[in-house]
């Protein structure tokens, strides 16, 4: 047998290379591994779709981990508890507010990540998206590079991931939508054709609009969670996550329907 040092390194390089090669062409390429996109990845992978999620940071989970101001608890309303049940996440009803529940944000983040991966989605962490593939009438994939390359400003050409559908799950900045508007001159399905911008906090409105604004904004290009709210000028809602989870489930259904046309 080869030296164990060589066995370890060879196995890692071989396994990762196979994983990446198998996901250079996918059904759905997602950008950002926050709660909404992870829910979408979970349901789409369960439905048999080939899903790759690209996350800039080392740790997926988005803004879930820290709860509210580092108090690692979050709130979810009753409309979203079925999603928690699907993922095996525990929750406790708030005695003074029936229909609202607290849950451990670390458990939720961990369960979302595990659920998506266990269902068959692949998460590529420490990988940034610097551009989209655009062929005039449809968004057709992503242009990716290592996050350290991006942050160090190294002159290294990227690689591409071809996809039938692209999901912007980048949260408040709507990074992929911004690329689409500013670089590809795409006109989004918004009142102005551009990104309207997120408004201040209004919990009730923000929760409702997060779900309402989740949709296909251009052929092949979808947005969920706070990215969708930013596109349509919705309000933010803080550490209540029902809307985010339901947005992820909604966009999974929309993408699945689009793929099966």
Residue ranges and their predicted role:
Residues 1-27, 194, 199-203, 222, ...:
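Extreme N-terminal leader/targeting segments of oxidoreductases
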Residues 21-52, 244, 251-252, 256:
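N-terminal Rossmann-like FAD-binding beta1-loop-alpha1 element of flavoenzymes
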Residues 29-31, 54, 160-172:
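Short hydrophobic core segments
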Residues 45-65:
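Glycine-rich FAD pyrophosphate-binding loop
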Residues 66-90:
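N-terminal glycine-rich dinucleotide-binding loop that anchors FAD/FMN and/or NAD(P) in oxidoreductases
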Residues 88-165:
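Feature captures the FAD/FMN-dependent oxidoreductase FAD-binding
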Residues 168-183:
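Flavin (primarily FAD) binding-site architecture
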Residues 231-260:
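A conserved FAD-binding loop/helix module that cradles the flavin
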């Amino acid at each position: 047998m080869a030296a164990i040092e060589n066995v370890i390194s060879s196995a890692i390089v071989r396994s990762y290379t196979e994983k990446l090669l198998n996901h250079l062409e996918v059904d759905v390429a997602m950008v950002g591994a926050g709660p909404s996109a992870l829910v979408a990845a979970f349901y789409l992978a369960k439905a048999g779709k080939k899903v790759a999620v690209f996350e800039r940071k080392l740790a997926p989970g988005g803004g879930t981990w820290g709860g509210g101001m580092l108090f690692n608890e979050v709130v979810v309303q009753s409309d979203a508890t079925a999603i928690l049940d699907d993922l095996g996440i525990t929750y406790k009803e708030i005695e003074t507010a029936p229909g609202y529940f607290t849950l451990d944000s670390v458990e939720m983040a961990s369960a979302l990540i595990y659920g998506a991966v266990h269902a068959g989605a692949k998460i590529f962490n420490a990988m940034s998206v610097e551009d989209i593939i655009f062929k005039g009438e449809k968004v057709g994939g992503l242009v990716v590079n290592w996050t350290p390359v991006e942050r160090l400003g190294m002159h290294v050409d990227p690689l591409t991931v071809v996809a039938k559908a692209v999901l912007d799950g980048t949260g408040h900045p709507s990074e992929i939508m911004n690329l689409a508007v500013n670089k590809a001159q795409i006109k989004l399905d918004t009142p102005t054709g551009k990104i309207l911008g997120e408004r201040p906090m209004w919990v009730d409105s923000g929760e409702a609009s997060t779900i309402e604004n989740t949709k296909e904004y251009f052929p092949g290009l979808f947005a969920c969670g706070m990215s969708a709210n930013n596109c349509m000028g919705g309000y933010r809602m803080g550490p209540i996550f029902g809307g985010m989870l339901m947005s992820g489930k909604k966009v999974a259904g929309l993408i699945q329907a689009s793929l099966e046309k």
